[in-house]
């Protein structure tokens, strides 16, 4: 394929010119919480440009996977409707870290453009920053001055932020000819279609101060980026990036799947382009460990997937289809990006699960939306913000889907009102947790640190030490003395107590001297660098400046350390059993148990749980030492085998927990050898959010106790069932089968008894127009009501059946509508929604069946009276 060839030739060219060829980084940014996804080739070198880290080379070239779907660079809504916008693309780039500058960068760009890309020299138009005479002069060595265009800061000046590295840039544009517009130079081409940008050279030569002053950098650098898809677009001479080899092959697969031919100018053509692009975006993101969810980048990914599904429906693709197109993507890009091949099955599974869930949402909310549309047409041609919010909040229908369907129906949505309700809901859901930070606000602790200094933590090597009291905090203020019986915070100059952080709970213990004893119930960080001992003074009084002995509860600390190290083992084991996509999403470590949240798209099977448990226990038995050491953060960044976590802020020096095969940056306390953990048992595995699973586990004595309880339960069952232990399961299965038979026989007996009643019920059917209607209050149980409704509908195939039963403090109602009457507009769910307010209850269902329960059984008769009136109006019966 041409794309593969150009990518390879680009990298080979720069390799010949002493550039280090660096593999594309993940689309998931490393240690950069400012980015949702990597969106440029320079992202992985950001710290190098900022001088925060260093590489063994000063020249580099890459082909970087990029995703642009949020923030400043958000191309999502344009994708499918223009010839060049993509959410996923590859960026070719060459970089200089204080080595070469403008002269060589321009020469490299010219040679690659004309020799590697094979572009006609006379069609290349450089642009420069209006004040950058140096770059203008350099370009005159390659093109006539009249083909060099000057632009202002908006187009030709680049900055990393309000402050920091910045500099002019020079773009390379390619003149596609008069077929793409009448403009004769770039300044006349407002659409950007004729003079298409394909490469941008950034000259980082200044450091912008907060005052706005730009000082020259001691070592200017180069950052360039060329969109591979645009290069291929120009190389092939086609109208759009979607007609290039890789994307067009995906579109061809969509044609086969949908049975609809792709014609670029047709109204339906946008759907082909959206699906082709979004499949690449989704597949690469999932391969790199991102999963669709309701938060952060997972939310953005879910939004992309649902947009693809919505456009798929315009091509009559009503069932999950993305996984069926995936093999085409893997076949064209898998050789260059093996993560696609390795993760293909998992990508397909996640895509299908997400599509199925969204299709269910569309079906559930779609019927209600149709009713809202009819109501809106009858009023002011506007779907109210309240209705839109209810569709989203109650039925899960995305606002994007509501807007799209409304537009297709010739309606508008009251978006300001919708946004108001959305914001109000967010405000209601924000819970305020009272912590030490809110006792008096952070300012008081910030001032305290400035005066008294940070707390020195010595707990990695000492369980007990002598220290001086530097602060006492009682009832929201600092005091000079704490009295017996008072609760508060004690601050020390040095402490062995670990403060709650990184999921690990704080230590407990005592602070004491000859005059007093303070029980430490928790240890927290109220402000960066400050450790607070939270608890109660049991005896005596405690004053600022006094010396005390600070002692942690050693047994408790050891249990916590064992559980924390076991958490690292669990994390490693999950990678081995489930795959490299596993990412930590949270953890809690306390003396009793550990809890670990991680990204995964489905529940663990019994076999997977057993494999994970067995692997962790195998490693515990091997009893390897657990090494803990500190290194410079920039050194840790260079080591690919050390795990660190996105969004976590690390200092210049970091602590590594090294178990040979598992290395993580971690500031917590750990056991000295794996054998100390003893035993590992999984208590529970569950889902806590879309795409996030949770494992709860115990170790040591707690695990032994759990094992003993399981054994005791098994022995008790064997005794009760009067069989040996190895036959318990067989006996239970036999009893279950017998129970099923008994229940079936009881149902048959009940049916025979009810048939007598049913004959009487059928005689009470009334005719409303041509429709058979049975509305009846009975003295049946809920189970009997269900049986009766089914038996009556078997005998009367076309009817509205509404049966109710009153009990002393509640009532129950069941509704069933035959298929022919549903088609005439009679809806069981609508009926139950009318009945429930009258009996002060709640309920719901579908078009054919619904049920509900109420708190006012005495109102059952009135409810049935009202529903008769409703049905008469619905059927136009007087």
Swiss-Prot record:
Keyword Aminoacyl-tRNA synthetase: yes
Substrates-to-products reaction catalysed: tRNA(Ala) + L-alanine + ATP = L-alanyl-tRNA(Ala) + AMP + diphosphate
Designated name of the protein: Alanine--tRNA ligase
Subcellular location: Cytoplasm
InterPro entries (UniProt xref): aa-tRNA-synth_II/BPL/LPL (IPR045864), Ala-tRNA-lgiase_IIc (IPR002318), Ala-tRNA-ligase_IIc_anticod-bd (IPR018162), Ala-tRNA-synth_IIc_core (IPR018165), Ala-tRNA-synth_IIc_N (IPR018164), Ala-tRNA_ligase (IPR050058), Ala_tRNA_ligase_euk/bac (IPR023033), DHHA1_dom (IPR003156)
Family that this chain belongs to: Belongs to the class-II aminoacyl-tRNA synthetase family.
PANTHER family cross-referenced by the UniProt entry: ALANINE--TRNA LIGASE, CYTOPLASMIC, ALANYL-TRNA SYNTHETASE
Listed Pfam families: DHHA1 (PF02272), tRNA-synt_2c (PF01411), tRNA_SAD (PF07973)
Entry function: Catalyzes the attachment of alanine to tRNA(Ala) in a two-step reaction: alanine is first activated by ATP to form Ala-AMP and then transferred to the acceptor end of tRNA(Ala). Also edits incorrectly charged Ser-tRNA(Ala) and Gly-tRNA(Ala) via its editing domain.
Keywords: Aminoacyl-tRNA synthetase, ATP-binding, Cytoplasm, Ligase, Metal-binding, Nucleotide-binding, Protein biosynthesis, RNA-binding, tRNA-binding, Zinc
Cofactor(s) demanded: Zn(2+)
SMART domains, sorted: tRNA_SAD
GO cellular component: cytosol
Cofactor note: Binds 1 zinc ion per subunit.
Source organism, top-level taxon: Bacteria
Catalytic activity, EC: 6.1.1.7
Binding of Zn(2+), residues: 564, 568, 666, 670
One Gene Ontology molecular-function label: aminoacyl-tRNA deacylase activity
Database matches in PROSITE patterns: AA_TRNA_LIGASE_II_ALA (PS50860)
An annotated GO BP: alanyl-tRNA aminoacylation
Entries under SUPFAM superfamilies matching the protein: Class II aaRS and biotin synthetases, Putative anticodon-binding domain of alanyl-tRNA synthetase (AlaRS), ThrRS/AlaRS common domain, Translation proteins
Domain notes: Consists of three domains; the N-terminal catalytic domain, the editing domain and the C-terminal C-Ala domain. The editing domain removes incorrectly charged amino acids, while the C-Ala domain, along with tRNA(Ala), serves as a bridge to cooperatively bring together the editing and aminoacylation centers thus stimulating deacylation of misacylated tRNAs.
Keyword Protein transport: no
